[in-house]
Design a protein with these regions (language model features):
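Active-site acidic/histidine proton-transfer and metal-coordination neighborhood
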Residues: 76-156
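N-terminal pre-domain/capping segments
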Residues: 1-70, 74-93
């Protein structure tokens, strides 16, 4: 890894591997990307070919430091049980995708407590992270919580 690092969030349009090629073209040594469409819950599974192309692009571009960012739909702080369960399951899927790609971190905004209060929101986040820790036991990928400006009911 170069001493001077420059990174950007790159589009995965056309394939995950293309995000690395776009990063290289723009002079990046670090790239952040989504491991699936950032505004949809559903995603087709990663294929062996997707993973092979991505790992090859890491080698050929020299961009070895790649961070994933979770989709914007995931809200680990929500008080609504069905929404919380869907968020935890979706984030577990994204962590699995990142693991398959050999990524070290998935960045996530903790979410919004939607008026239930900061303490309640933090409790929901902790419960989600506890469950996820069990579900990703043995994975190398880690969760990186990204702070927010704290507007409205956001936590972090």
């Amino acid at each position: 890894m170069p001493a001077d690092r420059l990174g950007a969030h790159m589009s995965i349009a056309g394939g995950l591997h293309l995000a690395l090629e776009r990063g290289k073209t723009t002079g990046c040594s670090v790239v952040q990307l989504f491991v699936k469409n950032q505004v949809q819950w559903a995603a087709r599974p990663l294929t062996d070919e997707d993973v092979r192309r991505f790992k090859k692009a890491r080698r050929t571009t020299g961009i070895t430091e790649v961070f994933a960012h979770s989709t914007y739909l995931i809200n680990l702080a929500t008080p609504a049980e069905a929404e919380w369960r869907r968020a935890v399951d979706a984030f577990a899927d994204e962590l699995g995708r990142a693991e398959a790609l050999g990524l070290r971190f998935v960045v996530i905004h903790p979410g919004s407590h939607k008026g239930s209060g900061l303490e309640a929101g933090i409790s929901r986040i902790v419960a989600a992270l506890d469950e996820l820790a069990g579900r990703i036991r043995g994975y190398r990928v880690r969760i990186a919580l990204e702070n927010t400006a704290g507007a409205g009911h956001t936590v972090g």
